[in-house]
Amino acid sequence: MGDYLVKALAYNGQVRAYAARTTETVAEAQRRHQTWPTASAALGRALTAGVMMGAMLKGEETLTIKIDGGGPIGVILVDSNARGEVRGYVTNPHVHFELNEHGKLDVARAVGKNGMLTVVKDLGLRDFFTGQVPLISGELGDDFTYYFASSEQIPSSVGVGVLVNPDHTIRAAGGFIIQLMPGTEENTITRIEERLKQIPPVSRMIERGLSPEQLLEQLLGDGGVRVLETMPVSFVCRCSRERIADALISLGPEEIQDIIDKEGQAEASCHFCNETYHFDKAELEQLKQLAKKE
């Protein structure tokens, strides 16, 4: 089965939980952007968090995550929606370091800690919610945990992980978000905290073949996990040749003529998916005529 996420409740509705397997989704991002291992881990963690946060939205609502920690990777930008679709990129995909002291990919060094995590939710009808917090670790799981507590006032635990093969392909990726509802009993909190200390890294559990449902059983085993919804997850970009053409038309006929005179063609790439669109001279002439009608 491919990538998917689950939404669930546990401990008689005191706890809301999300878990996702994103191995193929992160692999598609790696393939498109040709990211090196540390950059793959950083982008993959952000994509995984983004797709789970997207699952908290409704209808046509969308969400954008921007992570700018001042590190060599530059900015990470992720878009997601309520349908399990996510896309994203890093400014500098060719970043890699030796493993850190814990034997893991050094995401914190790549991302940096001197910056911000920003979340913008487009709730429709020009209604936007923006939350912003300083990065506290650069490892991203801790940073999203802090975001939920500080910006949305929801006590949460976020775990995201990516394992990368020696040939730069993605071996495993996934994550979880556990959130405490108002009035959660102290003994429930204690049991979850103890469980979180005992579990292996989430990427290792995914590598071992655990499903999102089984992840939640590991995290909330005695809490009576009740799955509410299962949703496929994938890397999907909304760019298209038509959208790029519209962007060229919006430049106006003079600007398009300038491109024809100087270049004789136009080429545009989408930041999010790295797809390249080519327009030859004849096509530019057509777009110029359309621009005159605007």
Curated annotation (Swiss-Prot):
Post-translational modification: Under oxidizing conditions two disulfide bonds are formed involving the reactive cysteines. Under reducing conditions zinc is bound to the reactive cysteines and the protein is inactive.
Disulfide bonds: C237-C239, C270-C273
Name of this chain's protein: 33 kDa chaperonin
NCBIfam families: PRK00114.1 (NF001033)
Gene Ontology BP terms: protein refolding
Gene (name only): hslO
InterPro entries documented for this protein: Heat_shock_Hsp33, Heat_shock_Hsp33_C, Heat_shock_Hsp33_N
Organism per entry: Geobacillus kaustophilus (strain HTA426)
Record flagged with keyword Chloroplast: no
Free-text function comment from the UniProt entry: Redox regulated molecular chaperone. Protects both thermally unfolding and oxidatively damaged proteins from irreversible aggregation. Plays an important role in the bacterial defense system toward oxidative stress.
A Gene Ontology molecular function term of the record: unfolded protein binding
Source taxon at top rank: Bacteria
Family assignment from sequence similarity: Belongs to the HSP33 family.
